[in-house]
């Protein structure tokens, strides 16, 4: 008889008076009923040939082979093809570099002198799209005075419609750099194409990868070759594991300075632009050591939703906020409806500061 007991997430297998901790079992192979001894041995050999140890558990209704060792690079289908195997289940997460189990301490990412993670909040503010030097300069000055420590602005804009404003491109990037020199805020902007990797690596302090490119694996691999930190937004339909695995692509390619950004997921609800998944913060805090910030602007798509969602995100333990701020949102070329005016952003940060103090953080 197989018995499993759960206590504080620690499971034990009891079999033939031998106790194996659940944490030692990294993959479980469930065999089909009435599998012969010969076939059990064959499957065990398949496992050991991959450099793993096995632990056989015989139950009244099923037989299970527990795989002990590093299974992160092993495809379960290698075992599923055997005629005696019913199913294979991973117990060990397939990501390693991003895994808190291998890196218990929270990571703190330095963005040109601004630390994201730990006790200080990363506060990213600015317009959805760069429209002019004067526009970005005014917003940056006011946002910095309110407490923002990074400047965002879209130079290249991924739009659903090919007829929508696509951004100023390299001209917009030059404007951001000029405002950075004037105001002193490090800049954050989205990279869409590998052809701009070199110029972004030279000029951008925090390179943003948008939701649409979260699983652009060729691009993620290239980002691993850069020495700039990466802000990785969650895809519209991405699970937690898929999101972390995308971060793992960047880290496995050589760049471990990755910040995760929750920006809402697509659900059945159509009243809001997306649904902000705030429970991702404690979940990811448990699964990974990477910093987690929240973008409440893109989540709701409405400016009046930004304030309550931003405060809720900080209360839930987010390491920062990415908020769209515009001096004239009614005339904005992109996403004006979800942008805060500078005075509203200033009022919001005063409240955020109070919440941050309660949870041991500061602006």
Region locations from a protein language model:
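Alpha-helix-loop-beta-strand connector modules within alpha/beta enzyme cores
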Residues: 166-188, 223-229, 280-292, 338-360
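Catalytic alpha/beta core domains of metabolic enzymes, predominantly
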Residues: 226-325
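Active-site mouth loops of central-metabolism enzymes
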Residues: 121-138, 162-166, 188-190, 211, ...
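Glycine-rich, proline-tolerant flexible connector loops at the mouths of alpha/beta enzymes
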Residues: 152-170, 327-339
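Active-site-adjacent beta->alpha loops and helix N-cap segments on the catalytic face
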Residues: 101-105, 161-174, 195-196, 211-227, ...
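Hydrophobic faces of well-ordered beta-strands that scaffold small-molecule active sites
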Residues: 122-127, 151-153, 187-189, 207-209, ...
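Catalytic beta/alpha-barrel core
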Residues: 32, 185-193, 205-216, 229-240, ...
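Non-catalytic terminal accessory/regulatory regions of metabolic enzymes
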Residues: 3, 10-123
């Amino acid at each position: 008889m197989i018995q499993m007991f759960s206590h504080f997430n620690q499971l034990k297998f009891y079999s033939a008076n031998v106790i194996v901790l659940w944490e030692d079992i990294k993959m479980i192979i469930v065999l089909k009923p009435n599998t012969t001894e010969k076939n059990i041995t064959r499957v065990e050999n398949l496992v050991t040939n991959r450099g793993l140890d096995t632990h056989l558990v015989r139950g009244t209704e099923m037989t299970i082979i527990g795989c002990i060792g590093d299974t992160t690079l092993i495809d379960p289908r290698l075992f599923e093809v055997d005629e005696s195997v019913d199913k294979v289940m991973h117990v060990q997460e397939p990501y390693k570099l991003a895994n808190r189990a291998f890196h218990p301490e929270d990571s703190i990412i330095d963005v040109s002198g601004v630390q994201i993670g730990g006790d200080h909040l990363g506060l990213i503010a600015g317009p959805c799209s760069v429209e002019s030097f004067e526009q970005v300069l005014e917003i940056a000055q006011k946002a910095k005075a309110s407490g923002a420590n990074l400047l965002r602005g879209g130079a290249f804009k991924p739009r659903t419609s090919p007829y929508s404003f696509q951004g100023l491109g390299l001209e917009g990037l030059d404007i951001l750099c000029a405002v950075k020199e004037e105001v002193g805020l490090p800049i954050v902007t989205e990279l869409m194409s590998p052809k701009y990797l070199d110029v972004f690596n030279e000029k951008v302090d925090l390179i943003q990868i948008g939701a649409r490119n979260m699983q652009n694996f060729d691009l993620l691999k290239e980002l691993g070759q850069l020495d700039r930190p990466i802000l990785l937004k969650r895809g519209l339909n991405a699970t937690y594991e898929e999101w972390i695995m995308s971060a793992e692509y960047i880290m496995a390619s050589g760049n471990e300075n990755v910040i995760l950004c929750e920006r809402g997921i697509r659900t059945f609800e159509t009243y809001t632009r997306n649904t902000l998944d705030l429970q991702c913060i404690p979940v990811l805090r448990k699964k990974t050591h990477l910093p987690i910030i929240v973008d409440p602007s893109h989540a709701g798509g409405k400016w009046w939703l930004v304030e309550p969602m931003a405060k809720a995100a900080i209360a839930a333990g987010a390491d920062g906020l990415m908020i769209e701020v515009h001096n004239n949102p009614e005339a904005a070329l992109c996403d004006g409806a979800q942008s805060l005016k500078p005075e509203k952003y200033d009022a919001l940060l005063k409240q955020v500061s109070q919440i941050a103090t309660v949870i041991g953080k500061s602006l």
